[in-house]
């Protein structure tokens, strides 16, 4: 071993003593290859990138943020994907996207931490922006969303104007820049025809904390805890009863809420800016007077922030585009989370009993089967408090979405109803019915616009039942934010939420987790995202498509194809799934494509009994086979033999 090590050392000495040696030439070649690979990795991003310079808030110098021009980014993706190009062409046939009648752009932003959810580093948190278009059929698919900007949260917060300034610059570039959607439009060429597609901002989607940082709003803990209704005050403010026209977050009557108009919002921003100038520039008012202005208007002054950028005013209507996210309102330590815990506590349901119930052989939709079988972990020991009690429901949004219908069934069938328990049960059921309605609208089973009034009624009824049972002690700003959902439904006729944003985070995550160097971090992250997007576009399919490889159904039906799974209305249906068709149910036997249309070959069940308001019993193996159009099928939440 000594002789081998010595020989190796002598060889290395000869290499470094003789720079012209073959070995060193190989090292140079390796370095050259690394540079080539690095250039290739960044090539797509560099072709659409630009640099924005930001001043730091508390230190000298400037930060150069490398960003993708949104319009050029769309053009790049269209050039790399014929399938995406066809989607745009199909959308153009329905909506021309002219300057007078533009498309509607949806912009979402959120922060996330790369790494395991139980082992993450907050210093590596990144702020991501994504956009798509309302007119695209694939707007709920990740391939139809574009990521123009990623920035480390710590870096964004250290800039003058913070995240709000970053958002303002992005909006200006997106709509009013040299390639802006409102000024120039997207040039699209398809089958020899050339079009310019214009777009305006229709939806700005984030959670409450995102709007706090992105707009300069003082947030849910402020005197004005609702950015969409300016007559709503914090709970126990002692002002609502003394100020006519004002209510608190405990208000259950939507008719008493005043929806903030664009003029009113801009006036508030102007008042805040004027007060800030009078104090810091002219010293004409006291610090206490300034604080009172900020409290009463519910806004902070943010230099360069989106609410105080005069370039955007009258040209990019971001305020009326604000879209409250129902996922965070209900599922992220939200309204449904609280309601489920209150019902569990009231019924004295033990964690071990709930675990056993959730571990029964439930059949979930195929794509959710793995997660569904793990729902019992919500009540496992490591999610309980030190005494082994469920002091709160510790569950992710997707877990809670799968849990709530099973909890409702548990309380319906396993808990003895008593007069004392009735108010708790009524409140929980009313909350579940609100979520049921939102999910039906999200899946396209009902029209959000036509159902907006129903949503208002269900929200008001739930809040009244909750207050009748618990008082106002458990109410939080998210309860009053529910009222904002119906206003947006009437405007959009579409349900936008954070689930698509969470899915888009998965495109950033692989590059972010591998990142070791902090040099030009944003360039590296966006290069990885864009490369991944281009790769995924190569397998992009239609809004209804097979997931697996289809085969001929029969030699007698050569033009009929079948497969084991397909995507329909953003749902993944698999053979063996229990499906609904209006009031009927059945088992999916095959996914079928015939004559250019998709169907499900379904063995229909026979209705046996209605066990509860939300659970029915059916007789299976009837031999009654039907061919059902794909768009008429829906999934059950869970089934049991």
What residue ranges belong to the model's regions?
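Charged (Asp/Glu and Lys/Arg) segments that form or flank catalytic channels of large polymer-
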Residues: 5, 9-107, 111, 176-409, ...
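Active-site-proximal structural scaffolding
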Residues: 107, 124, 167-168, 219, ...
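Short helix/loop capping segments that flank catalytic or ligand/cofactor-binding pockets
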Residues: 115-118, 139-141, 234-238, 330, ...
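E2/UBC-UEV (E2-variant) core
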Residues: 122-186, 239-287, 291, 594-641
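Terminal interaction-prone segments of large eukaryotic proteins
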Residues: 2, 28, 35, 55, ...
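Catalytic-core region of right-hand nucleic acid polymerases
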Residues: 78-99, 103, 112-162, 516, ...
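Beta-strand cores of modular interaction/reader domains in eukaryotic scaffold and signaling proteins
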Residues: 106-108, 113, 130-132, 227, ...
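Core residues of folded domains in eukaryotic genome-function proteins
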Residues: 101-105, 125-129, 222, 497, ...
């Amino acid at each position: 071993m000594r002789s081998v090590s010595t020989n190796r050392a002598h060889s290395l000495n000869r290499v470094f003593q003789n720079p012209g040696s073959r070995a060193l030439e190989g090292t140079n070649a390796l370095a050259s290859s690394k540079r080539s690979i690095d250039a290739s990795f960044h090539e797509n991003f560099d072709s659409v990138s630009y640099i924005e310079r930001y001043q730091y808030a508390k230190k000298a110098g400037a930060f150069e943020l490398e960003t993708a021009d949104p319009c050029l980014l769309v053009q790049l993706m269209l050039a790399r994907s014929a399938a995406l190009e066809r989607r745009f062409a199909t959308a153009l046939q329905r909506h021309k996207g002219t300057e007078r009648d533009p498309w509607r752009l949806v912009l979402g932003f959120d922060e996330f931490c790369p790494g395991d959810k139980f082992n993450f580093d907050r210093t590596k948190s990144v702020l991501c922006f994504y956009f798509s278009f309302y007119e695209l059929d694939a707007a709920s698919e990740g391939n139809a969303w574009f990521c123009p900007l990623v920035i480390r949260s710590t870096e964004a917060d250290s800039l003058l104007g913070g995240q709000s300034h970053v958002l303002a610059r992005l909006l200006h570039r997106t709509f009013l820049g040299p390639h802006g959607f409102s000024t120039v439009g997207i040039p699209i060429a398809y089958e020899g025809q050339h079009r310019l597609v214009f777009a305006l901002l229709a939806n700005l989607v984030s959670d409450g904390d995102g709007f706090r940082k992105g707009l300069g709003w003082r947030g849910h803990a402020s005197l004005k805890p609702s950015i969409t209704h300016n007559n709503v005050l914090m709970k126990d403010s002692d002002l609502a009863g003394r100020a006519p026209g004002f209510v608190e977050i405990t208000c259950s009557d939507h008719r008493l809420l005043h929806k903030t108009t664009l003029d009113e919002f801009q006036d508030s921003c102007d008042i805040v800016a004027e007060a800030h100038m009078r104090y810091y520039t002219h010293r004409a008012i006291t610090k206490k007077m300034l604080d009172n202005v900020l409290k009463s208007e519910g806004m902070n002054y943010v230099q360069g922030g989106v609410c105080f950028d005069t370039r955007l005013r009258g040209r990019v209507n971001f305020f009326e585009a604000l879209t409250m996210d129902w996922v965070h309102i209900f599922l992220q330590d939200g309204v449904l989370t609280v309601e489920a815990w209150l019902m569990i506590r009231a019924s004295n349901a033990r964690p071990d009993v709930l675990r056993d119930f959730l571990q029964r052989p439930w059949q979930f939709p195929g794509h959710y089967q793995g997660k569904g079988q793990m729902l019992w972990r919500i009540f496992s020991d490591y999610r309980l408090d030190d005494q082994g009690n469920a002091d709160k429901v510790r569950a992710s949004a997707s877990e809670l979405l799968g849990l709530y219908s099973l909890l409702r069934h548990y309380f319906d069938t396993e808990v003895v109803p008593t007069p004392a328990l009735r108010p708790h049960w009524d409140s929980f059921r009313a909350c579940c019915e609100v979520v049921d309605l939102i999910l039906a609208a999200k899946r396209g089973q009902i029209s959000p616009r036509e159902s907006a009034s129903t949503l208002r009624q269900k929200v008001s009824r739930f809040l009244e039942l909750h207050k009748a049972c618990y008082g106002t002690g458990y109410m939080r700003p998210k309860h009053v934010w529910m009222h904002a959902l119906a206003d947006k439904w009437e405007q959009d006729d579409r349900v936008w939420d954070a689930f698509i944003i969470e899915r888009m985070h998965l495109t950033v995550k692989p590059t972010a987790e591998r990142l070791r160097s902090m040099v030009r971090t944003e360039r590296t992250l966006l290069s990885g995202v864009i490369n991944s997007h281009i790769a995924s576009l190569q397998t992009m399919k239609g809004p209804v498509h097979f997931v697996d490889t289809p085969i001929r159904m029969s030699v007698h039906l050569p033009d009929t194809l079948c497969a084991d799974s397909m995507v329909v209305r953003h749902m993944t249906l698999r053979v063996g799934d229990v499906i609904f068709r209006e009031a009927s149910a059945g088992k999916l036997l095959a996914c079928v494509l015939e004559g250019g249309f998709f169907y499900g070959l379904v063995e229909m069940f026979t209705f046996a009994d209605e066990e509860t308001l939300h659970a029915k019993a059916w007789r299976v193996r009837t031999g009654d086979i039907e061919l059902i159009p794909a768009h008429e099928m829906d999934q059950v939440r869970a089934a049991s033999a």
